[in-house]
Amino acid sequence: MSLNNITFCVSQDLDVPLKVKIKSLEGHKPLLKPSQKILNPELMLIGSNVFPSSDLIVSLQVFDKERNRNLTLPIYTPYIPFRNSRTWDYWLTLPIRIKQLTFSSHLRIILWEYNGSKQIPFFNLETSIFNLKDCTLKRGFESLKFRYDVIDHCEVVTDNKDQENLNKYFQGEFTRLPWLDEITISKLRKQRENRTWPQGTFVLNLEFPMLELPVVFIEREIMNTQMNIPTLKNNPGLSTDLREPNRNDPQIKISLGDKYHSTLKFYDPDQPNNDPIEEKYRRLERASKNANLDKQVKPDIKKRDYLNKIINYPPGTKLTAHEKGSIWKYRYYLMNNKKALTKLLQSTNLREESERVEVLELMDSWAEIDIDDALELLGSTFKNLSVRSYAVNRLKKASDKELELYLLQLVEAVCFENLSTFSDKSNSEFTIVDAVSSQKLSGDSMLLSTSHANQKLLKSISSESETSGTESLPIVISPLAEFLIRRALVNPRLGSFFYWYLKSESEDKPYLDQILSSFWSRLDKKSRNILNDQVRLINVLRECCETIKRLKDTTAKKMELLVHLLETKVRPLVKVRPIALPLDPDVLICDVCPETSKVFKSSLSPLKITFKTTLNQPYHLMFKVGDDLRQDQLVVQIISLMNELLKNENVDLKLTPYKILATGPQEGAIEFIPNDTLASILSKYHGILGYLKLHYPDENATLGVQGWVLDNFVKSCAGYCVITYILGVGDRHLDNLLVTPDGHFFHADFGYILGQDPKPFPPLMKLPPQIIEAFGGAESSNYDKFRSYCFVAYSILRRNAGLILNLFELMKTSNIPDIRIDPNGAILRVRERFNLNMSEEDATVHFQNLINDSVNALLPIVIDHLHNLAQYWRT
């Protein structure tokens, strides 16, 4: 049997510098019109606005895309004056050898033009140095196409047969006939020079060296860890600044200051980098030969206290090099401490083979971590697939009720598991689903278990997904997504929330759309019918809301239209068969009550709709179109979680976490609980006690209200004071502080959170004097109970701060407005409210002072009066 021989060389054997030829730039952008030259004469200083073949300079730089670090300094083409075309034909030799390249090495190409005497970027491009499909070094010609008006985006021209044939000819794949080759090559080159592109489209032509043999990338593994200690020159742990190089940046910034203080500042480009000496010491210290010695090491009392201090740091705290070294040194001693695992992973460089292998083995023997630590491992910081799979395995032990509390954040965490983001390539945990059959099949028969045989397919998906459409490619389901899908298939309630969370977030996140398709394809007929009914209900409610909003008439006319729409559109739908409400899938509705439904006076015309359940109970909800409810949904979910945490400690503060579900980016439903605003209560009853007396009077009680009602009021006030303080809820006024007839106090409208507030000098806690008056005054026993409830609630929530902070950490990349403004700052503000650096006694004193300041504050009272005055003039 004959074998095909393939001759090639490996990149590690090539001790020659990398060369790239900048050939030419085709295309031109629209020039300035005469009117533009008159109105904006400064634009004429930019050459490309005036001349079709304006002067350009090209810079090349090699960078490692996976590790986010530069490998060389940029080098530039010389100045060449152009006439009719932009042609350089100039070889650039980069200061790096081929054997030093990594597989993720890319070329950063920047075209520079002149704005007067100053150089400015014309366009930024990048291209890989190795072919992603076969791991070979690029050879021959390559063309990069880009549009001038699409920033930082380019693509390799793959449909150019002439260029492909030229490459094959120079690589020796065609039989050479000198008399014919000369004619053919000159004709092919002339065709390439005469090709035209649409205005605004450019093509940069490059040429890589035409080596005789293909060069295959191979990374050799050195077994002796101590011999593999990098120097400053090739240290892969050093991070560099990835900003675009600007040749006009000053290297020294000088400020004169005054005669007493010097403010001379030097720019140090190495300041953010790791210290090479410390890096070298770290690698020596963690060499595999020391592992056996570390197993016997135990800390003394002082060191043990130091380790406990590190372990108790809140999530997201960055450890110093010394702290990381201490955790690593005593890793075997800490194996029984479940809280120490996340700190160990922070202290480990998972890109180092020896460290990664050892830590992953340790994880299997580590004490089982809590759910809050598992959630931390699913954040954007931990990209190693094995670590994330470990966290998913821990989540598998959580109950459906627990999973529902964290489901919103887990859906966001799925976005971190895009295949291309992982630092390791052992993607054996992924599930591959056929995208075509997923539209037709259901059940598990269409799943393909990933093994070594299809890892090649997995890699091709990640490399080809950028150039080819994802519609015909297989869907890659990460371990977390697969876990959520399987749990959602088993539990219809969980499945309903999972569907709507994906639906509301998938508009700008294509990966979530793939997960939604996979989930839908595996639903059985009954579950699919349930969700189909919910979708039809939401579509009808949206149509009703938009129809009423378009009606420019009185509220009475809108009410008539609402009654008509409910009777003709909603009632026929819910009468066919009971529908599980998306807000609460356990509630089945079978009819609608138009007589108790209404349209609110607002520019968005939200609808309050009353449904009749199969238990013959009314269910009120509000449906809005044109408002993003995802922030309110997050806040209510966190309030529900905090309520469960308090109840787990046998502390029931009578909270009212009404349900909110965003069914899209600009629409959603809200559970409507019968209530009155504090502004309305004070206007009608001149006090909260008068309102409570009307519904539940008791002549024998001191304040004239039944004891359990007043108990509800005191407890719920304490709970919401603590929670809104921690979440930094802003824009608090008497119109979004609500009270139910049985004394439950709660907040509504969470448009401003995490310290954001439209008013100046907002209070840290909203505690109106009317509430203290309803307690019986600041000297009453109810006020003392209120304070004690606050202290207990604050203490319990501080003990669970890690869980809450991890949930916010998972929402960093979400579209929540007040998180999107400053994701890191938002989490920092929540952490500050917990005051985790304080002892239990100091935290209680802090909250006592907070209550005192809120009770005695005058500015919030003035702002409330101004708000009431503004509301009066609006109505």
UniProtKB/Swiss-Prot annotation:
PROSITE patterns named among the record's database cross-references: C2_PI3K, PI3_4_KINASE_1, PI3_4_KINASE_2, PI3_4_KINASE_3, PIK_HELICAL
Family annotation (SMART domains): PI3K_C2, PI3Ka, PI3Kc
Matches recorded under Gene3D superfamilies: C2 domain, Phosphatidylinositol 3-/4-kinase, catalytic domain, Phosphatidylinositol 3-kinase Catalytic Subunit, Chain A, domain 4, Phosphatidylinositol 3-kinase, accessory domain (PIK)
Region (Catalytic loop): 728-736
Protein name, per record: Phosphatidylinositol 3-kinase VPS34
Name of the gene encoding the protein in the UniProt record: VPS34
Superkingdom of this protein's organism: Eukaryota
Lineage, uppermost ranks: Eukaryota, Fungi, Dikarya, Ascomycota, Saccharomycotina
Organism: Saccharomyces cerevisiae (strain ATCC 204508 / S288c)
Domain PI3K/PI4K catalytic, residue spans: 593-859
Remarks, miscellaneous: Present with 1080 molecules/cell in log phase SD medium.
